[in-house]
């Protein structure tokens, strides 16, 4: 483990750019950091992305592994990094020796992500850990999907802590060409892609009962953990519903 990362985790303190010392909080778990590093080492992406930087712990995990595999760039989007977080996340990553990998966007994600798409940026791994309401997180996923390579992985943080993020995980599992992964491997899916039952009884149940009762998380391959990674198995295609395309009126209860 990088010495700066180890020190921050051991002391539970981070140093801001102005020299002030701040108690560490709101960081990803060690298990999630280890999962991110496994994904980077297995996927070997050239470019990675995260939405929400905070004190830079997730960026440190990603950059450490990205440097090992010869990656070129880690894109960080965080409109509050220079203010609420006192640049502590960026400064910590720089102190760890990964400044050359960083590309920082001091913009809300709904503004930064379309610019990246317009510039033709593609990423192999993305972490969504920004504003935790369903609308903002959904917009983050929508644009990340446009940037993510087929075979790449998107990870959602706080999937058990915030109902809106769990709901987004259910949307991805039921509507898009993604497979949830086991948290110890980038190569082994938890379940096959979701296919809604065509039966009339099941359709009636979907109307009467909550979707989570009809399709429990476990049947969708969603673990109870506080982070879930999804592998993208195909680009999004709009069409008539055949050949993996989505109809203009596609909807499944989720």
State each model region's role.
Residues 23-27, 33-254:
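S-adenosylmethionine/decaboxylated-SAM
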Residues 1-35:
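Mobile, glycine- and charge-enriched loop segments
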């Amino acid at each position: 483990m990088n010495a700066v990362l180890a020190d921050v985790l051991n002391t539970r303190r981070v140093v801001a750019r102005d020299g002030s010392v701040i108690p560490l909080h709101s960081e990803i778990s060690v298990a999630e950091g280890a999962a991110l590093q496994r994904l980077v080492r297995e996927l070997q992406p050239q470019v990675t992305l995260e939405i929400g930087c905070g004190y830079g712990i997730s960026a440190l995990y990603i950059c450490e592994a990205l440097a090992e595999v010869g990656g070129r760039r880690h894109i960080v989007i965080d409109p509050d990094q220079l203010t609420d977080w006192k640049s502590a996340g960026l400064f910590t990553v720089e102190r760890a020796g990964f400044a050359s990998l960083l590309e920082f966007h001091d913009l809300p994600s709904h503004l930064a992500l379309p610019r990246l798409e317009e510039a033709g940026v593609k990423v192999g791994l993305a972490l969504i850990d920004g504003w935790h309401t369903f609308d903002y997180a959904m917009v983050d996923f929508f644009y990340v999907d446009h940037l993510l390579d087929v075979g790449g992985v998107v990870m959602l943080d706080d999937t058990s802590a915030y109902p809106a993020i769990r709901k987004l995980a259910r949307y991805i599992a039921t509507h898009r060409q993604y497979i949830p992964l086991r948290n110890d491997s980038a190569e082994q899916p938890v379940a096959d892609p979701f296919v809604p039952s065509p039966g009339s009884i099941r359709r009636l149940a979907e109307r009467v009962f909550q979707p989570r009762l009809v399709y429990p998380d476990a049947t969708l391959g969603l673990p109870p953990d506080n982070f879930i990674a999804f592998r993208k198995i195909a680009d999004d295609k709009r069409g008539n519903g055949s050949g993996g395309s989505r109809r203009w009126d596609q909807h499944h209860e989720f």
